């Protein structure tokens, strides 16, 4: 203990102040995280700091001082020290970890790759014209391994080609040509390593939520819950109307099929009996025209006319259905509005 006190006494005051400042920032914000800043230009970091100033505080400090501050705060906070690696900055916010992750992803922008840098993925130059007129640029592209020629008075790439595979170092000539072609293979920004919120540590794999899929999952879950409630006859505020309608339809069907003479099914029973009667009469008339009287003949004629009219009306109904298709587009817009509402959940 004496040795630790002796060591502490020799810490410069500016370091003590820095440790206290980190502790105060952690305690005054709901969430804090650690981000990788290795390889990011100072100007880019300053721009990100300005862009986030209304929602987050970005602080760059020495890892050793950050570690001391975390250890002094105790509880589960010291577990965040395992995310201190190479060049690390701290970020503080009162937003949720999900919102913080999304904000940091939005800071990322395409950036040119330097000579000697390792390609994070295959670098592909697409076939097509460039903005360059014929000149020395043609030879420069070819010497960089980019197949180029003159086409319609412009330098053009003759074929789509992988000019550098993932994991390979980018040659000097190729790096120069990629910048001239405005091909930026790197995505530069702050990578969140972890976020701490009220005793819980969130890693980026958990925070990378696909909002479209999440929205679809919620819709599907609601539909499944609704169907389960209806099929198991479990009444809720959302399903009681459907359950009552289903019960009414099933009871009416039972009454009709069992020929139960109740006021609620008499119309259906009479309609069913009428259909059966006309069917029998029609078959009898086909065998013997004198088998039915004039009244039945009139009924059969009316039924035949109705059937013919229905046949003529079918194409018109199909056309009307096509005219109703714009309503489906309105439903799509409604779903998009729903997704926008879900987006607000994550910022």
From Swiss-Prot:
One of its GO terms (molecular function) is large ribosomal subunit rRNA binding. Residues 325-338 have a biased composition (Acidic residues). The keyword NAD does not apply. InterPro entries: Ribosomal_protein_uL10, Ribosomal_uL10, Ribosomal_uL10-like_insert, Ribosomal_uL10-like_insert_sf, Ribosomal_uL10-like_sf, Ribosomal_uL10_arc. Keywords: Ribonucleoprotein, Ribosomal protein, RNA-binding, rRNA-binding. One of its GO terms (cellular component) is cytosolic large ribosomal subunit. Residues 310-347 are annotated as: Disordered. It comes from the Archaea. One of its GO terms (biological process) is cytoplasmic translation. Pfam families: Ribosomal_L10 (PF00466), RL10P_insert (PF17777). Signal peptide: none annotated. SUPFAM superfamilies: Ribosomal protein L10-like (SSF160369). Part of the 50S ribosomal subunit. Forms part of the ribosomal stalk which helps the ribosome interact with GTP-bound translation factors. Forms a heptameric L10(L12)2(L12)2(L12)2 complex, where L10 forms an elongated spine to which the L12 dimers bind in a sequential fashion. Forms part of the ribosomal stalk, playing a central role in the interaction of the ribosome with GTP-bound translation factors. This is Large ribosomal subunit protein uL10. It comes from Methanosarcina mazei (strain ATCC BAA-159 / DSM 3647 / Goe1 / Go1 / JCM 11833 / OCM 88).
């Amino acid at each position: 203990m004496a040795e630790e006190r002796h060591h502490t006494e020799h810490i410069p005051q500016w370091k003590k102040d820095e440790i206290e400042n980190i502790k105060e920032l952690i305690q005054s914000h709901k969430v804090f995280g650690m981000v990788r800043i290795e390889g990011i230009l100072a100007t880019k970091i300053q721009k990100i700091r300005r862009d986030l100033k209304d929602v987050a505080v970005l602080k760059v400090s020495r890892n050793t001082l950050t570690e001391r501050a975390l250890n002094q705060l105790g509880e589960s906070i010291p577990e965040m020290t395992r995310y201190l690696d190479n060049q690390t900055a701290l970020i503080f916010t009162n937003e949720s970890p999900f919102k913080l992750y999304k904000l940091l992803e939005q800071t990322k922008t395409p950036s040119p790759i330097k000579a000697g840098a390792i390609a994070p993925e295959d670098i592909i130059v697409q076939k097509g014209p460039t903005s360059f007129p014929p000149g020395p640029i043609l030879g420069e592209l070819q010497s960089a391994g980019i197949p180029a020629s003159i086409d319609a008075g412009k330098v053009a790439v003759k074929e789509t080609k992988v000019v550098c595979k993932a994991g390979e170092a980018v040659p000097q000539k190729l790096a120069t040509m990629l910048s001239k072609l405005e091909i930026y293979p790197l995505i530069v920004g702050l990578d969140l390593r972890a976020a701490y919120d009220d005793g819980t540590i969130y890693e980026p794999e958990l925070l990378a939520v696909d909002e479209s899929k999440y929205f679809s999952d919620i819709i599907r879950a609601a539909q499944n819950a609704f169907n389960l409630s209806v099929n198991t006859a479990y009444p809720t505020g959302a399903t009681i109307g459907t359950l009552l309608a289903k019960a009414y339809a099933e009871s009416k069907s039972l009454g009709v099929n069992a020929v139960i003479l109740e006021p609620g099914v008499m119309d259906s029973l009479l309609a069913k009996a009428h259909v059966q009667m006309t069917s029998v009469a029609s078959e009898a008339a086909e065998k013997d025209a004198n088998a039915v009287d004039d009244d039945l003949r009139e009924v059969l004629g009316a039924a035949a006319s109705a059937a013919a009219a229905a046949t003529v009306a079918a194409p018109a109904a199909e056309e009307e259905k096509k005219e109703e298709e714009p309503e489906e587009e309105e439903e799509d817009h409604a779903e998009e509005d729903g997704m926008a509402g879900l987006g607000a959940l994550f910022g």
